[in-house]
Design a protein with these regions (language model features):
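Conserved pre-motif I regulatory segment
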Residues: 1-34
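Conserved helicase ATPase motor motifs in RecA-like P-loop NTPase domains
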Residues: 37-38, 155-170, 178
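Walker B catalytic acidic pair
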Residues: 131-132
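Conserved Walker A/P-loop ATP-binding site and its immediately adjacent core
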Residues: 44, 57-79, 167-172, 340-342
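Conserved RecA-like P-loop NTPase helicase motor core
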Residues: 109, 358-455, 463
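Conserved helix-turn-beta segment of the N-terminal RecA-like "Helicase ATP-binding" lobe
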Residues: 69-92, 183
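Conserved Helicase C-terminal RecA-like lobe
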Residues: 1, 27, 39-40, 44-62, ...
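Inter-lobe coupling linker of SF2 helicases/translocases
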Residues: 107-112, 118-122, 143-156, 160-161, ...
């Protein structure tokens, strides 16, 4: 398959599946680009926009993306296209002036859409590109979703970019496709869509209810999705990706004292939940908030009577991680360590400092500019072998494979803490498994035996939702 006559890519030679994706986007007025992480969604979208600029009288493109990857988008546009890009940020007045700039591409983050709706509407963008749409265009009621849906109605062309179209909340399909084709695929009424394709169930004996897909409608849903979307996953093009070694699970055993501490906290949590009216009155958010205390114990710390976090005297999971770090470091290979908790990151940093091992760390406290500087520095600097990140802050939009790594090397990703949302883990895993890299990829999950770590790992690897499991069967059954 070839690109249209007279149209060529710049700087990068596309793979066959990318050519097919670009052609699909050119042939369809609106297109969902469903490529797994690291397969080049951005490159395909930019080239589809380039074609429309050159052939379809489209002059103004608005890229809507997470705040943390705005600079990455600008860099990609300027690298693989002949056009300039403007990032919309600064004071409210500065943002309005930036929208007026006469560049082909403008880049904005989702949360700014509602506040800048009027000047964006006045600009009359020809093409809208929604990156990471499954994470940011969800429930139809938030203002950012409302603004995105309205702006999409006045654009000539629209693109959705996501690696995971249907996450744990398939109801979000409606908002995404309402953006993509103004209701052509799934209708213009959310409640009609919900009642047509879903039905309500109760979770176990609790009073909580959840909408699930009607299995008799799955074939119809798939048919509608792929009438406007193109999909490539890693399995289809595995011969073009780096080799992924078997996933490891480092199982850590608590000694008697730590097990007693864990069990006491667990009993306290169960008593609190029972005292405060059980799962029905508390709700999943408050219950998960309590269970975090068990995660913190397995990670090696606890909150004391003054409300301060303190390191436990016994930290078997941290000890196992440090041992792994030393082994990888001695082999002169690189590693990415993902944590959920800031205190976990602090403990790891102290252990690395003791051993005089250089590292780069990234947390949610870093600005978008700081994050970009950090991951790019790690990627380019051979002397720094360790990257430590807070998974919710760095799981999307960054690339953490070493640019100079060879096919004889292994790039390691170590998961120290888990989040409740498995999508976060999948997104983070894709940061080192990218198209075009040469080194092998290895994942290792650190799991404390007979603890919440093990329950979370087993539940998520069985493709189940942790919160649903807890609300269906109760906290006590989940923990035992």
């Amino acid at each position: 398959m070839k690109l249209p006559i007279g149209f060529e890519t710049i700087h990068l030679k596309p793979y066959p599946y990318q050519i097919e994706t670009i052609n699909y986007g050119i042939l369809h007025r609106n297109a969902g680009i469903l490529l797994s992480m690291g397969l080049g969604k951005t490159m395909c979208a930019i080239n589809i926009a380039r074609y429309r600029i050159q052939n379809d009288n489209c002059k103004k493109v608005l890229v809507i993306c997470p705040l943390t990857i705005m600079d990455k988008w600008k860099k990609e546009i300027q690298l693989i296209s002949e056009y300039k890009a403007t990032i919309i940020r600064g004071t409210p007045q500065q943002k309005k002036e930036l929208i007026k700039q006469d560049t082909h591409f403008h880049i904005i983050n989702y949360d700014a859409l509602a506040r800048l709706f009027v000047p964006l509407e006045d600009k009359k963008f020809d093409i809208l590109i929604a990156d990471e749409s499954a994470r940011f265009i969800q429930n139809p009621t938030p203002k950012r979703t409302e603004a995105a849906l309205y702006l999409s109605k006045i654009a000539k062309h629209r693109m959705l970019l996501t690696g995971i179209l249907i996450s744990k909340r398939p109801l979000n399909l409606w908002s995404q496709f309402s953006f993509l084709d103004k209701g052509k695929t799934f209708g213009d009424n959310f409640y009609r869509f919900r009642n047509t394709y879903f039905y309500q169930i109760s979770l176990g004996e609790s009073k909580f209810k959840k909408y699930v897909v009607n299995k008799r409608r799955i074939a119809d849903i798939n048919k509608k999705i792929f009438s406007t979307c193109i999909l490539f996953d890693r399995k289809e093009i595995s011969d073009q990706l780096p080799e992924v070694l078997p996933t490891c699970k480092s199982v850590i055993v608590m000694d008697e004292d730590l097990q007693n501490t864990y069990d006491n906290i667990k009993q306290n949590i169960l008593s609190e939940i029972a005292t405060e009216g059980g799962e029905v009155k508390l709700g999943r958010i408050k219950i998960l908030g309590r269970l975090i205390r068990l995660q913190q114990i397995t990670s090696g710390f606890i909150k004391d009577s003054t409300g301060e976090y303190v390191r436990l005297s016994q930290t078997p999971k941290l000890d196992a991680l440090v041992e792994e770090i030393e082994s990888i470091y001695d082999d002169d290979e690189s590693m990415v360590i993902w944590c959920c908790f800031l205190f976990s990151i602090d403990m790891i940093k102290k252990e690395l400092a003791k051993r005089e091992i250089a590292y780069i760390s990234m947390t949610g406290a870093d600005s978008a500019k700081e994050k970009n500087k950090k991951w790019m520095n790690y990627q380019k600097t051979n002397k720094i072998k360790v990257f430590i990140g807070q998974i919710v802050a760095g799981g999307i939009g960054i690339e953490l494979f070493k640019l100079d790594a060879t096919e004889n090397e292994i790039q390691h990703m170590l998961f120290y803490d888990r989040t409740w949302v498995f999508d976060h883990t999948e997104q983070a895993a894709g940061r080192i498994n990218r198209l075009g890299q040469k080194a092998k990829v290895r994942y290792n999950h650190f799991v404390v035996e007979n603890s919440i770590d093990e329950k979370m790992y087993d539940t998520q690897t069985s493709d189940k939702d942790i919160a649903d499991e807890i609300m269906s069967h109760g906290v006590k059954k989940f923990l035992t």
